[in-house]
Amino acid sequence: MQTKPYPVSIRSECFLPFGAGWVCPAPEEIRTLMQIAELTGSKAATLTGLKDSRTVRRWIGGDTPIPFSAWAILVEYAGLGKIWKV
């Protein structure tokens, strides 16, 4: 259940379940979500089970796409709902 409205600066397709048309967020959208959630790269790494923030830097730098599972964790942490639920 979504508790906050989705930010207009992030495409609505980024909040769909994986099998229902999810679109991988752009680096700027990842940065926006992290700002909303008040997450540092280190905290985002810890939440998503990463060893360090290097991979998070790759996501927000556009070098590596963020996996749906990691994005879903960050979305829920930001209070925007459980997008993984079908």
Walk through the language-model features, giving the residues of each.
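Recognition helix of helix-turn-helix/homeodomain-like DNA-binding domains
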Residues: 42, 48-65
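Residue-level marker of regulatory loop/turn positions in helix-turn-helix DNA-binding domains and
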Residues: 22-26, 63
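Secretory-pathway ectodomains
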Residues: 30-31, 48, 75-79
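N-terminal flexible/basic segments that precede or flank functional cores
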Residues: 1-23
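DNA major-groove recognition helix of helix-turn-helix/homeodomain DNA-binding modules
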Residues: 64-86
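Short basic helix-loop element that most often maps to the first helix and adjoining turn
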Residues: 27-43
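Alpha-helix N-cap/N′ positions at the starts of helices
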Residues: 25-28, 51
